[in-house]
């Protein structure tokens, strides 16, 4: 019999952080020296926001390269030498047949439009159907209020096809706040009927006049680049100052949604899994690989509508100077009765499995067999020759990241492995230890057991390896410290403060969060076997206020909105959460403050 066990330590966090750690001087320098190691759209976002803070000398350098400092938003000028255009739906495509910006004049169908432009036109027609008809996004703000037709000045969204700097596939440039011809309408996307934006922006898009020097099939490059970049224009129609990592992660998600067969997004996965110790929102470059987080959510936990809901929620947060991307994501998930902490933890579990088996349940990646990597990079490997008791003190871990430790249990005489989290829950931090048992060659091959507890004892007599995955969340810091110990035992006799817990009977009720609370509180619990579980909320006098039932295996959560079973809000005070089965009961106190 062969198993693999994976364990996770998880901590919770939602503090807004600085909107960008990349300085405007660094962004400007990348333009000046032609450095392409950062996506051009992110460089333009930083200059658009902070460009007026640059020194006169650097401003002059950028002006010489076509940047306009006359508006509140600093932007590059639109090309002025493209003498042809073709309209398709809401789009207008600008191009030329002469000079360095010329597209190939080949016109096989003799329709008067070059085949290269025809391909782009058809691509955008398909993109528009998915973005606006199927997914119901609001179209980007128009520039019809511009006085100069050469700068747009129509109701069409402008796409310019010309010779870009070496290495750039395409980009979207924010120019001005939507409807900035009036202080009353400034920042409001005129195409959103039921909402009023404050930071929506007019943009234009740039694509190359050819992709001859790029590896890959040109038509596929055009498709994924167009889907990705145009979604930036859509995003800017909600909040142009949203965090770069979130913009890029969801734009990569969108290109995969449009062109799932191309899988250009796979290029970002290897680095993402090679650096699990970096937060999913670490920086904009990390954001490209973080698309897999949203793929996990929409494949397993929620419909594709989540992506739209995120940007609808982004209207509520002014992210100009402060990164509110996590609160935005939390709010969007809550609209689907999903808890950010729970589903993010589930995401880390899924990364530890990387399985396309139906038995993986909500931790499944349907395309995992084609992913270009295996499990995330290991932080450390522990073997039979390691000490019997190992302590890990003051281990640093970035929020929204994970550390993976492998315990090799082959060729050893010890039978039990104890995982003991020494760092306890606090008002600022939450901790979880989750284990995954993968059955390979026993009576239930290709199945998994998933369970959670802060102290776990695992029978490893027939187990090949154990992987600990430590991940972190916290209130007021982007780093966390944790301590734990690992004990190897050759018998079932453990230390006095330990308990041997059969893997099939390990229930847990974790501390509800946040506590105290004033609107909603999330209650996390683990069910390791098929058995009805009753979760009830009582007042301090023992009266049952609300009851929940669950039979779903694994780590689960419910959100209580402070109302009784009749939907009537309860008063402030102390309440008791009780989880019980035929063989298990545990309670937690919670405090409702209004």
Label the predicted regions:
Residues 4-13:
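Sec-dependent N-terminal signal peptides
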Residues 21-202, 208-230, 234-238, 432-437:
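Zn2+-dependent metallopeptidase catalytic core
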Residues 185-200, 220-224, 239-301, 305, ...:
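Acidic/His/Gly-enriched intrinsically disordered linker/tail segments
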Residues 317-498:
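Beta/coil-rich, acidic/histidine-enriched accessory regions frequently appended to metallopeptidases
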Residues 419-423, 521-527, 560:
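Aromatic/hydrophobic beta-strand junction motif of beta-rich domains
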Residues 495-526, 538-543, 572, 591-594:
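Surface-exposed, proline-anchored Ser/Thr-rich loop/turn motifs
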Residues 522, 549-583:
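Short, surface-exposed loop/turn motifs with a glycine/proline- and acidic-biased composition
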Residues 584-588:
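Extracellular and select intracellular beta-sandwich modules with Ser/Thr-enriched
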């Amino acid at each position: 019999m062969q198993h693999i066990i994976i364990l996770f330590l998880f901590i919770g966090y939602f503090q807004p952080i600085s909107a960008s750690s990349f300085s405007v001087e660094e962004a400007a320098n990348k333009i000046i020296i032609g450095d392409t190691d950062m996506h051009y759209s992110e460089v333009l976002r930083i200059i658009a926001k902070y460009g007026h803070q640059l020194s006169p000398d650097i401003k002059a350098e950028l002006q010489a390269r076509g940047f306009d400092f006359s508006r509140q938003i600093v932007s590059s000028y639109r090309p002025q030498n493209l003498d042809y255009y073709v309209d398709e739906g809401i789009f207008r495509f600008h191009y030329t047949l002469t000079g360095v910006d010329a597209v190939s004049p080949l016109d096989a169908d003799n329709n008067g439009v070059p085949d290269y432009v025809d391909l782009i036109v058809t691509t955008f027609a398909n993109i528009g159907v998915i973005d606006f008809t199927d997914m119901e996004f609001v179209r980007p703000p128009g520039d019809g209020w511009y006085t100069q037709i050469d700068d747009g000045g129509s109701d069409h969204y402008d796409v310019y096809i010309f010779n870009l700097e070496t290495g750039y596939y395409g980009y979207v440039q924010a120019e001005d706040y939507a409807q900035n011809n009036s202080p009353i309408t400034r920042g409001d996307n005129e195409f959103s009927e039921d909402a009023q934006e404050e930071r929506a922006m007019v943009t234009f898009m740039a694509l190359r006049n050819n992709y001859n020097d790029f590896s890959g099939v040109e038509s596929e490059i055009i498709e994924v680049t167009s889907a990705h970049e145009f979604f930036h224009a859509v995003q800017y129609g909600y909040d142009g100052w949203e965090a770069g990592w979130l913009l890029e992660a969801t734009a990569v998600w969108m290109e995969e949604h449009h062109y799932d067969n191309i899988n250009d997004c796979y290029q970002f996965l290897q680095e993402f899994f090679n650096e699990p110790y970096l937060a999913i929102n670490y920086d904009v470059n990390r954001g490209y690989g973080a698309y897999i987080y949203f793929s996990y959510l929409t494949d397993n936990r929620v419909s594709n509508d989540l992506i739209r809901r995120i940007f609808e929620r982004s209207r509520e947060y002014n992210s100009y100077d402060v990164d509110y991307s996590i609160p935005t994501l939390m709010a969007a998930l809550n609209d689907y009765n999903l808890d950010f902490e729970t589903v993010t933890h589930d995401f880390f579990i899924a990364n530890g499995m990387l399985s396309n088996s139906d038995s993986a349940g909500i931790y499944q990646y349907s395309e995992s067999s084609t992913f270009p990597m295996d499990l995330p990079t290991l932080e450390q490997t522990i073997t039979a020759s390691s000490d019997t008791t190992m302590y890990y003190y003051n281990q640093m871990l970035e929020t929204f990241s994970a550390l993976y430790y492998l315990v090799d249990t082959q060729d050893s005489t010890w039978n039990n492995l104890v995982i003991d989290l020494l760092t306890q829950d606090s008002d600022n931090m939450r901790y979880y230890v989750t284990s995954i048992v993968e059955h390979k060659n026993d009576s239930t091959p290709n199945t998994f057991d998933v369970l959670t507890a802060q102290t776990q004892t695992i029978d490893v007599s027939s187990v090949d390896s154990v992987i600990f995955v430590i991940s972190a969340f916290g209130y007021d810091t982007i780093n966390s410290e944790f301590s734990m110990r690992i004990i190897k035992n050759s018998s079932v006799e453990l230390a006095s403060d330990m308990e041997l817990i059969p893997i099939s009977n390990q229930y847990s009720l974790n501390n509800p969060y946040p506590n105290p609370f004033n609107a909603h509180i999330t209650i996390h619990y683990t069910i390791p076997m098929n058995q009805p579980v009753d979760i009830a909320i009582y007042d301090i006098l023992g009266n049952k206020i609300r009851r929940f039932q669950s039979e779903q295996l694994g780590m689960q959560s419910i959100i209580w909105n402070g109302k009784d079973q009749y939907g009537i809000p309860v008063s402030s005070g102390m309440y008791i959460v009780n989880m019980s089965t035929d063989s298990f009961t545990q309670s937690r106190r919670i405090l409702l403050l209004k």
